[in-house]
């Protein structure tokens, strides 16, 4: 087939650029219609004219092809493309064959002259695009969907059968045209009735000037056959790349697409008589929505009505409103296409679901939540310039089973087991208005515009400008009290209303000018910011800001009474108890700064009022749990009180009220999961993984020595002390932790399913080897960016199949030692699973560079707890044998430490831990 001519609307560039652009485009092999022109004068042999569609007029340029001829077919293609982009709701299947072109001829009696051949079009003509009478009503109704695999964060339902889309990721298909959602099993049954509302754009906006978009499409557009190889969308859709319609979105050229039912079947069904539905009461075993009102069918059984012919589901109250459009039982090749049919239909796939190379920003954009395999994308991109593949061959290829070279596992993500907690807007203004005050250092009463947010009180010069007089951070407020007699009050001055006490100054706020026995003279209005009522509202607002996370329904007042209401006790890590201490007097909690959430509570950022030290405060709502579980709520505190190790997060203290428990811990930089997802490839290099895993194992060794099993080990619970490339890590979240002896077993439900060992999932007894399984999963997800197991298959079967556990992408880049360690940790039989010390002795972790990195970390933090002095001579000898440089400062450090009694004591303690574990 000859190279088609280029169709481009003119753009305001220089004539020289026009010739260069046109020549370059003409030299591109296999290039299709390039929608945007090189500007200025038309190239030799080119014809510039206008296409008019209704009230819209677009300039285009028709160039000669390689044979020197013009093609009317490409004028039609350009017209279809303009219709699709400017009037997507008006396009339909087969538009190309159902349009006529007329040339405006003012000199003729019949102004519109039918264009039969391309030579009828002259320079500067106005060509009218008219819909042929052969376009039937059925043509307008047939609009195929553009279906792509999609991952949902919120519960979603199939718009065909009404049932919920199940799974963690890739639960179903979303149409790019209309945004509807479907099961994969329903894709072959849904009618081709896409509305295309998501693709619509204003029809009065000219396409001229969008050169970057249209030019880009020219690079990808080839001679498009009548039946596209991928999902058959309306004619204009298949002639352009996705980047044309969705600027800035991820290209879907290599994503998995699904084809709906044959268009011929839709034409056949159009001729069928539509009759009323035959509804019968139905009991649903899965969550299902009414297909009329799109609301959930509630109840345990007999939730709604279902048509016994077409399986349409609805509420009883909605049945009278449902249109009489039942087509009965629709079958093709003996397969029932009604929504309720559960038959497994083989899908036609446009390309492989290549997702072993994960994007670090998984599902950040809900509309573009697909992930692609980079290697396969490059391979397909190289073959894209070649000749078109045989459609039948592609169809046979698409029906094959998934290749072991690609991973079908769940991509790594943050697993939340509790109610979804949204992050509140930062610095939200809680109250603002005029207020007066004086201080313990300056008795002159001043008036400012106060603005209270979640972190501070700002005293502005006026209510509109940005200049301010002073900031009072809430974390520095030590006390908020009603007014007391003060020697600083000037003689004869009106008293203040309440006091704000900080470490350096006391603010006397408000002016109590109105006494109960008198009223303002001449009934005059008080100046803004003056009066007891205004001051009282400010006092309450500040009290709420000081203790922002309070139980629902509890009232917060000021003064000593409120302290007695919400204060019970404080339990410090040294087990001392102080009665009637309010957490808001010691710490400021920032409700905007949500650090994390789990099954037992939410973690907020906070600050110690006197020292200004940053802390993390976990708030546990006791009202969410039955009385029997209250002991479990204190489990984390009880364990952390007895743990003092650099690899475990430090517990500062614990407060408790009748409704809540406040656990105050040291605040760290972030977590390991964030580090994995934010890395360049969505996974960590081996040397960083070794560095982190060694620290985790050392902390676990200390826990197991104390007979403590974490039971919920995952990257979210491994915190980073800094933003360094090689940070110190600490274990946190001991809410599931258990005291388990060396040979003891427990059966209680613990942990996060994605990281749990099989014995827990099967309700069998477990021991401390449970944590070692979790370490194996952490190593796997760190190196690959995916979870090791597919949710649809048995774990034991998947472990036996190495081809699916370790697909070449990315495991061909990872050492065999790492895979060997993972295999020894992911052992279904507990007795075969590696222990902590055996894991630390594995060749993958016995690495010289890792040892050096860990020693540098210990030097940086000033404490040696990861490596041991007994290994120094071994690694120094290894460096000499391999010709590697051994850091001189480590030699001097090891010599000085070996002579100290503290070093001997630490050595004996570490030795006793190892012996106890072994």
UniProtKB/Swiss-Prot annotation:
<feature type="modified residue" description="Phosphotyrosine">
    <location>
        <position position="755"/>
    </location>
</feature>
<dbReference type="GO" id="GO:0008270">
    <property type="term" value="F:zinc ion binding"/>
</dbReference>
<dbReference type="Pfam" id="PF00069">
    <property type="entry name" value="Pkinase"/>
</dbReference>
<dbReference type="GO" id="GO:0004697">
    <property type="term" value="F:diacylglycerol-dependent serine/threonine kinase activity"/>
</dbReference>
<feature type="modified residue" description="Phosphoserine; by PKC/PRKCD">
    <location>
        <position position="744"/>
    </location>
</feature>
<dbReference type="GO" id="GO:0006954">
    <property type="term" value="P:inflammatory response"/>
</dbReference>
<dbReference type="GO" id="GO:0071447">
    <property type="term" value="P:cellular response to hydroperoxide"/>
</dbReference>
<protein>
    <recommendedName>
        <fullName>Serine/threonine-protein kinase D1</fullName>
        <ecNumber>2.7.11.13</ecNumber>
    </recommendedName>
</protein>
<dbReference type="GO" id="GO:0030018">
    <property type="term" value="C:Z disc"/>
</dbReference>
<dbReference type="GO" id="GO:1904385">
    <property type="term" value="P:cellular response to angiotensin"/>
</dbReference>
<keyword id="KW-0723">Serine/threonine-protein kinase</keyword>
<keyword id="KW-0472">Membrane</keyword>
<dbReference type="GO" id="GO:0042307">
    <property type="term" value="P:positive regulation of protein import into nucleus"/>
</dbReference>
<keyword id="KW-0037">Angiogenesis</keyword>
<comment type="similarity">
    <text>Belongs to the protein kinase superfamily. CAMK Ser/Thr protein kinase family. PKD subfamily.</text>
</comment>
<dbReference type="GO" id="GO:0010595">
    <property type="term" value="P:positive regulation of endothelial cell migration"/>
</dbReference>
<feature type="zinc finger region" description="Phorbol-ester/DAG-type 1">
    <location>
        <begin position="144"/>
        <end position="194"/>
    </location>
</feature>
<dbReference type="InterPro" id="IPR020454">
    <property type="entry name" value="DAG/PE-bd"/>
</dbReference>
<dbReference type="GO" id="GO:0010628">
    <property type="term" value="P:positive regulation of gene expression"/>
</dbReference>
<feature type="modified residue" description="Phosphoserine; by autocatalysis and PKC/PRKCD">
    <location>
        <position position="748"/>
    </location>
</feature>
<keyword id="KW-0053">Apoptosis</keyword>
<feature type="region of interest" description="Disordered">
    <location>
        <begin position="379"/>
        <end position="410"/>
    </location>
</feature>
<dbReference type="GO" id="GO:0005634">
    <property type="term" value="C:nucleus"/>
</dbReference>
<dbReference type="GO" id="GO:0043123">
    <property type="term" value="P:positive regulation of canonical NF-kappaB signal transduction"/>
</dbReference>
<dbReference type="GO" id="GO:0045669">
    <property type="term" value="P:positive regulation of osteoblast differentiation"/>
</dbReference>
<dbReference type="GO" id="GO:0046777">
    <property type="term" value="P:protein autophosphorylation"/>
</dbReference>
<keyword id="KW-1003">Cell membrane</keyword>
<feature type="modified residue" description="Phosphoserine">
    <location>
        <position position="217"/>
    </location>
</feature>
<keyword id="KW-0460">Magnesium</keyword>
<dbReference type="GO" id="GO:0034599">
    <property type="term" value="P:cellular response to oxidative stress"/>
</dbReference>
<dbReference type="GO" id="GO:0060298">
    <property type="term" value="P:positive regulation of sarcomere organization"/>
</dbReference>
<dbReference type="InterPro" id="IPR046349">
    <property type="entry name" value="C1-like_sf"/>
</dbReference>
<dbReference type="InterPro" id="IPR015727">
    <property type="entry name" value="Protein_Kinase_C_mu-related"/>
</dbReference>
<dbReference type="Pfam" id="PF00169">
    <property type="entry name" value="PH"/>
</dbReference>
<dbReference type="GO" id="GO:0005829">
    <property type="term" value="C:cytosol"/>
</dbReference>
<dbReference type="GO" id="GO:0010976">
    <property type="term" value="P:positive regulation of neuron projection development"/>
</dbReference>
<dbReference type="GO" id="GO:0051092">
    <property type="term" value="P:positive regulation of NF-kappaB transcription factor activity"/>
</dbReference>
<dbReference type="GO" id="GO:0035924">
    <property type="term" value="P:cellular response to vascular endothelial growth factor stimulus"/>
</dbReference>
<dbReference type="GO" id="GO:0030154">
    <property type="term" value="P:cell differentiation"/>
</dbReference>
<keyword id="KW-0547">Nucleotide-binding</keyword>
<dbReference type="InterPro" id="IPR011009">
    <property type="entry name" value="Kinase-like_dom_sf"/>
</dbReference>
<dbReference type="InterPro" id="IPR017441">
    <property type="entry name" value="Protein_kinase_ATP_BS"/>
</dbReference>
């Amino acid at each position: 087939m000859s190279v088609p001519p280029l169709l481009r609307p003119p753009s305001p560039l220089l004539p020289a650029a026009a010739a260069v652009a046109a020549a370059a485009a003409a030299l591109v092999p296999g290039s299709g219609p390039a929608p945007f022109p090189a500007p200025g004068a038309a190239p030799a042999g080119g014809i510039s004219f206008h296409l008019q569609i209704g009230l819209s007029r677009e300039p285009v340029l028709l160039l000669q092809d390689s044979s020197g001829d013009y093609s009317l077919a490409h004028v039609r293609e350009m017209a279809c493309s303009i219709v699709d982009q400017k009037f997507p709701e008006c396009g339909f299947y087969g538009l190309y064959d159902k349009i006529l072109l007329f040339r405006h001829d003012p000199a003729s009696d019949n102004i519109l002259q039918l264009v039969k051949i391309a030579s009828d079009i002259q320079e500067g003509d106005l060509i009218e695009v008219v819909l042929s009478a052969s376009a039937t009503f059925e043509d307008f109704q047939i609009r195929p969907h553009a279906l792509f695999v999609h991952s949902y964060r919120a519960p979603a339902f199939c718009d065909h059968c009404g049932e919920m889309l199940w799974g963690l990721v890739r639960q179903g298909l979303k149409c790019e045209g209309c945004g509807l959602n479907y099961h994969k099993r329903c894709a072959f049954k849904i009618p081709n009735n896409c509305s295309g509302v998501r693709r619509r754009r204003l029809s009065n906006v000219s396409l001229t000037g969008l050169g970057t978009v249209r030019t880009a499409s020219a690079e990808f557009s080839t001679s498009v056959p009548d039946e596209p190889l991928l999902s058959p969308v309306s004619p204009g859709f298949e002639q352009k790349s996705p980047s044309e319609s969705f600027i800035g979105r991820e290209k879907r050229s290599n994503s998995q697409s699904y084809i709906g039912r044959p268009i011929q079947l839709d034409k056949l069904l159009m001729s069928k008589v539509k009759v009323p539905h035959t509804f019968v009461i139905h009991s649903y075993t899965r969550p299902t929505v009414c297909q009329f009102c799109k609301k959930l069918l509630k109840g345990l059984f007999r939730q709604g009505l279902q048509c016994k012919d077409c399986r349409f589901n609805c509420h009883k109250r909605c049945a009278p409103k449902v249109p009489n459009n039942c087509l009965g039982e629709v079958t093709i090749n003996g397969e029932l296409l009604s929504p309720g049919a559960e038959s497994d239909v083989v899908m036609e796939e446009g390309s492989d679901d290549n997702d072993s190379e994960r994007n670090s920003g998984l599902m950040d954009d809900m509309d573009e939540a697909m992930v692609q395999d980079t290697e396969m994308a490059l391979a397909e991109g190289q073959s894209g310039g070649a000749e078109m593949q045989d459609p039948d061959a592609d169809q046979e290829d698409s029906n094959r089973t998934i290749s072991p070279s690609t991973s079908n596992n769940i991509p790594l993500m943050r697993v939340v087991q509790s109610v979804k907690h949204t992050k509140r807007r930062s610095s939200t203004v809680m109250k603002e208005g005029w207020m007066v005050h004086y201080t313990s250092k300056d008795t002159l009463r001043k008036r400012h515009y106060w603005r209270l947010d979640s972190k501070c009180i700002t005293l502005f010069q006026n209510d509109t400008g940005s200049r301010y007089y002073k900031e009072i951070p809430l974390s520095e407020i030590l006390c908020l009290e009603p007014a007391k007699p003060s020697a600083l009050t000037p003689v004869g001055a009106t008293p203040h209303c309440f006091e704000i006490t900080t470490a350096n100054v006391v603010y006397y706020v408000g002016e109590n000018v109105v006494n109960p026995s008198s009223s303002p003279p001449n009934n005059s209005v008080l100046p803004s910011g003056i009066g007891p009522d205004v001051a009282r509202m400010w006092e309450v607002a500040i009290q709420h800001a000081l203790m922002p996370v309070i139980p629902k329904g509890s009232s917060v007042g000021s003064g000593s009474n409120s302290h007695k209401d919400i204060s019970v006790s404080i339990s410090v890590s040294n087990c001392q108890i102080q009665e009637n201490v309010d957490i808001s007097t010691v710490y400021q909690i920032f409700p905007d700064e949500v650090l994390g959430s789990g099954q037992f509570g939410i973690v907020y950022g906070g600050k110690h009022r006197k020292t200004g030290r940053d802390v993390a405060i976990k708030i546990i709502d006791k009202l969410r749990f039955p009385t029997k579980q209250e002991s479990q709520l204190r489990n984390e505190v009880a364990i952390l009180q007895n743990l003092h190790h650099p690899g475990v997060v430090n517990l500062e203290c614990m407060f408790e009220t009748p409704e809540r428990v406040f656990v105050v811990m040291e605040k760290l930089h972030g977590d390991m999961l964030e580090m994995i997802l934010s890395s360049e490839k969505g996974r960590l290099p081996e040397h960083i993984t070794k560095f982190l895993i060694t620290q985790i194992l050392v902390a676990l060794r200390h826990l197991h020595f104390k007979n403590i099993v974490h039971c919920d080990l995952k990257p979210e619970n491994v915190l980073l002390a800094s933003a360094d490339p090689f940070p110190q890590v600490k274990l946190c979240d001991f809410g599931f932790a258990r005291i388990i002896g060396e040979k003891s077993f427990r059966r209680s439900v613990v942990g996060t399913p994605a990281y749990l060992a099989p014995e827990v999932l099967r309700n069998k007894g477990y021991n401390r080897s449970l944590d070692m399984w979790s370490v194996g999963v952490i190593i796997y997800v760190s190196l690959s960016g995916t979870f090791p197991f597919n949710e649809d298959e048995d774990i034991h079967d998947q472990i036996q199949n190495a081809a699916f556990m370790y697909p070449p992408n990315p495991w061909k880049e990872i050492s065999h030692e790492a895979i060997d360690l993972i295999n020894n940790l992911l052992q279904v039989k507990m007795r075969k699973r590696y222990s902590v010390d055996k894991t630390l002795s594995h060749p993958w972790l016995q690495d010289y560079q890792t040892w050096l990195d860990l020693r540098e970390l210990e030097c940086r933090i000033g404490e040696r707890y990861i490596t041991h002095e007994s290994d120094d001579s071994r690694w120094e000898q290894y460096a000499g044998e391999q010709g590697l440089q051994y850091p001189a400062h480590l030699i001097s450090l090891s010599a000085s430490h070996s002579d100290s009694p503290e070093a001997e004591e630490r050595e004996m303690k570490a030795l006793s831990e190892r012996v106890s574990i072994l």
